[in-house]
A protein has these predicted regions:
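Long, compositionally biased stretches
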Residues: 5, 11-128
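Well-ordered secondary-structure scaffolds
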Residues: 40, 129-139, 143-146, 184-186, ...
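Acidic, glycine/proline-rich low-complexity segments that act as flexible tails and inter-domain linkers
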Residues: 114-202, 241-242, 422, 426
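Active-site-proximal beta-alpha loop/turn segments in soluble metabolic enzymes
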Residues: 158-162, 195-197, 235-238, 273-283, ...
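Self-splicing inteins and homing endonuclease
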Residues: 177-198, 254-280
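Glycine/serine-rich anion-binding loops at beta->alpha junctions
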Residues: 192-215, 219-231
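A glycine-rich helix N-cap at a beta->alpha junction
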Residues: 238-262, 332-338
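Phosphate/diphosphate-binding glycine-rich loops and adjacent basic-rich segments that engage nucleotide
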Residues: 259-308
Length: 522
């Protein structure tokens, strides 16, 4: 008799799941032990190798398992323990797994094999060049939100759909699937305006200024923003320096009802939760692909109840979009997807050749925002102009003013001080205002020769700010004083690095020594 082919691991799990007798109550139950292990957002379980459950179920390390307590259940990655950390009758849980099940130390929980995930087949098909239809995209996103995917599965999804591997229908399907994956806000107002920047340009923190001007004019602008993925600060990170941003949906509605606008963290309101999960992995992989970018942006806008959207699209040698051709391609795609999901949308292509403002990092960017809103003499002119340009475009898109009158209207509100008053009122409504501060340590970087500033590498100056500790340390980052075209002499100040620890300052300075072309002076 010939040898039978050995089934692969996935097939074995399927056979085990379908053919195995239903376990008795005692077979698959273990006593919970809280281990205090931080695995970020990934559910992880720990069981001894000689546990009766491991032996009876045939569990292997990194197996995906379902853990149940009453009506609650989670999916976790299983780690096998070969020590006395746990007893044979115990199961250890990571912090996120423990809190998700709402249990206590010593509770009994059940552990079983995870049923096969059909949606993984769609990802495999995509890897081999197939197209994923709307049904497949819905199943993928549903499994993402339910926590059925491990970090490995999430990484494979992001990689399979990265670059230009998504066609228009796939992007629309992903956007719609992400919209229905979470809550949606419905407003009393028929028109709700919004703004987004595709990112990649450090210091481009126009949002709080735009929200303040628009809200002061009486329009509704509930701005849900993201945290940084690959940059020194996201809008939510920067706003959080000055006011709470992790608000419930009920609280968001209350703030907007009172003030007409808000600037909050999108995931705090459970808008497009699939996007929040994917962003965590994209940040680790340093990937931000075209189709997923569009789906991420537009799904949250629709979920937030927006009807009119202006998109800031910076173009430059060291930002996400390197050419006008690339910007126009993304512009067309975004407008097509926006139309498919019911958004009135306008893309504004802007200059991305250098950082905006002075600060790079949450607290330092917050200082720039306040300087513009307060109409201070030394406020960054480029941040002010960008904010007014985009606000004007939004006012015209909404039909609030005639074509060509948007900038002028926005400038009057800003200059009058009404925008700053509105900003402070929004901060108070969100939970209270806090003045931004500098980090503990600082180090000045000077020009080593005279000349004209010819170029600034946005990615590298951002890297300096991140090595300094931003955005995790909100007060850390860079203050930048050498814009394009500026004549500098040897010894002139180019930028200042701010850190909370001496170690982070050391790493930032080591990077500056290695990368001599962060600022090119000729």
């Amino acid at each position: 008799m010939g040898n039978l082919a050995k089934p692969d691991y996935a097939t074995s799990l399927f056979i085990l799941y379908k053919m195995k007798k239903k376990p008795t109550k005692s077979t698959n139950k273990l006593k919970v032990r809280r281990l205090g292990i931080d695995t970020q957002k990934e559910h992880v379980a720990y069981i001894r190798a000689d546990s009766h459950v491991v032996i009876s179920e045939g569990f292997e390390a990194l197996a995906r398992v379902r853990i149940k307590k009453g009506i609650l259940s989670i999916v976790a990655s299983l780690h096998i323990v070969h020590s006395n950390l746990l007893s044979k009758g115990e199961i250890g849980l990571s912090e996120i797994a423990f809190s998700s099940l709402n249990i206590k130390n010593g509770d009994m929980i059940e552990i079983i094999h995870l049923e096969p995930l059909v949606s993984l087949g769609y990802i495999r098909a995509k890897i081999y060049g197939k197209t994923v239809d709307e049904k497949g995209m819905n199943e993928i996103v549903e499994d993402v939100v339910l926590g059925n995917y491990s970090n490995i599965h999430l990484s494979s999804f992001i990689t399979a759909f990265a670059g230009d591997h998504m066609n228009l229908n796939e992007i629309i399907s992903l956007t719609r699937a992400m919209i229905i994956s979470g809550d949606r806000i419905k407003w009393k107002q028929k028109m709700v305006v919004d703004k987004h920047c595709i990112g990649g340009l450090p210091g481009n923190r126009t949002t709080p200024i735009i929200v303040s001007i628009v809200s002061a004019l009486g329009l509704t602008m509930p701005k849900t923003s993201s945290r940084a993925i690959t940059s020194p600060a996201g809008t939510a990170d920067t706003m959080e320096v000055m006011a709470p941003v992790n608000l419930s949906m009920k609280k968001i509605k209350d703030v907007v009802d009172k003030q007409g606008g808000c600037v909050v963290w999108g995931s705090g309101a459970n808008l497009s939760p699939a996007d929040d999960i994917l962003i965590r992995i994209e940040r680790a992989l340093d990937l931000d692909s075209e189709g997923q970018l569009i789906a991420s942006v537009l799904s949250k806008k629709v979920a937030a109840g927006s009807t009119h959207l202006v998109v800031d699209m910076p173009v430059g040698d060291t930002v996400k979009l390197r050419s006008i051709e690339a910007a126009n391609h993304l512009k067309i795609l975004m407008e097509q997807v926006g139309n498919a999901v019911g958004l009135k949308l306008k893309v504004v292509v802007t200059d991305g050749s250098q950082p905006v403002g002075i600060g790079l990092g949450p607290s330092l960017e917050a200082m720039d925002i306040l300087s513009v809103l307060r109409n201070e003499k030394n406020a960054p002119a480029d941040l002010r102009e960008r904010s007014l340009l985009l606000t004007g475009e939004l006012l015209e898109l909404a039909g609030f003013v005639k074509s060509g009158k948007g900038y002028e209207t926005a400038a009057k509100v800003l200059s009058s001080g009404d925008a700053y008053k509105k900003f402070r009122a929004i901060c108070k409504a969100q939970g209270g205002y806090t003045e931004p501060e500098f980090a503990k340590y600082r180090h000045d970087i000077h020009a080593n020769h005279s000349g004209i500033v010819r170029s600034i590498d946005n990615r590298k100056i951002s890297r300096v700010a991140k090595l300094a500790g931003a955005p995790d340390h909100p007060r850390a980052g860079v203050r930048y004083f050498a814009p394009l075209g500026k004549a500098v002499k040897k010894g002139d100040l180019l930028y200042t690095i701010f850190t909370e620890t001496e170690g982070e300052l050391y790493y930032a300075l080591q990077y500056v020594k290695i990368e001599s072309d962060i600022i090119l002076i000729k």
